[in-house]
């Protein structure tokens, strides 16, 4: 019996917005793939590029970071910091030969449960097309 591959997706979610949207999606029974594991952080601005690389090198096939919409950060400028880091990370991934599509940044407010479910479903489809992530040392 052969096992079919299922992606392992990590969603690093801002406590104030994207995590609340994930909670709302669950409460309203909006389905999203069980391949998505949500990790709550205080702010998307606290997500260091190393966290994303660490997730990929330890079994994640894709990582999506969710934060508050620009201008709505609970900590004022955290999401702008996340955006700057993300642009640098995408350049680094490309230089290393890693598909930048494996990593994504999304702005999802606490009231956007449906958007959360839709984005996770779409990201799952993207990762399935890319296939398993193979880290070569």
UniProtKB/Swiss-Prot annotation:
Molecular-function GO terms, alphabetical: 2 iron, 2 sulfur cluster binding; metal ion binding; oxidoreductase activity
Keyword Acetylation: no
Cofactor note: Binds 1 [2Fe-2S] cluster.
Location(s), subcellular: Cytoplasm
EC number per UniProt: 1.12.99.-
Cofactor entry: [2Fe-2S] cluster
GO cellular component: cytoplasm
Enzyme class name: oxidoreductase
Keyword Lipid biosynthesis: no
Keywords: 2Fe-2S, Cytoplasm, Electron transport, Iron, Iron-sulfur, Metal-binding, Oxidoreductase, Transport
Family designation: Belongs to the MvhD/VhuD family.
Stated role: Part of a complex that provides reducing equivalents for heterodisulfide reductase. MvhD may form the contact site for heterodisulfide reductase.
Subunit structure: The F420-non-reducing hydrogenase is composed of three subunits; MvhA, MvhD and MvhG. It forms a complex with the heterodisulfide reductase (Hdr).
Protein name (record): F420-non-reducing hydrogenase iron-sulfur subunit D
Annotated source species: Archaeoglobus profundus (strain DSM 5631 / JCM 9629 / NBRC 100127 / Av18)
Phylogenetic lineage: Archaea, Methanobacteriati, Methanobacteriota, Archaeoglobi, Archaeoglobales
């Amino acid at each position: 019996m052969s096992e079919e591959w299922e992606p392992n997706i990590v969603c690093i979610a801002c406590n104030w917005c994207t995590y609340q949207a994930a909670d709302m999606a669950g409460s309203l029974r909006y389905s999203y793939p069980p391949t998505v594991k949500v990790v709550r952080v205080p702010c998307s601005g606290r997500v260091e590029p190393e966290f994303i690389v660490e997730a990929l090198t330890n079994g994640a096939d894709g990582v999506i970071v969710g934060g508050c919409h620009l201008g709505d950060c609970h900590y004022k400028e955290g999401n702008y910091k996340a955006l700057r880091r993300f642009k640098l990370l995408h350049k680094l991934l490309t230089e290393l030969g890693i598909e930048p599509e494996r990593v994504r940044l999304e702005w999802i407010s606490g009231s956007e449960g449906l958007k959360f479910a839709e984005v996770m479903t779409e990201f799952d489809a993207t990762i399935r097309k890319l296939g398993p992530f193979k880290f070569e040392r």
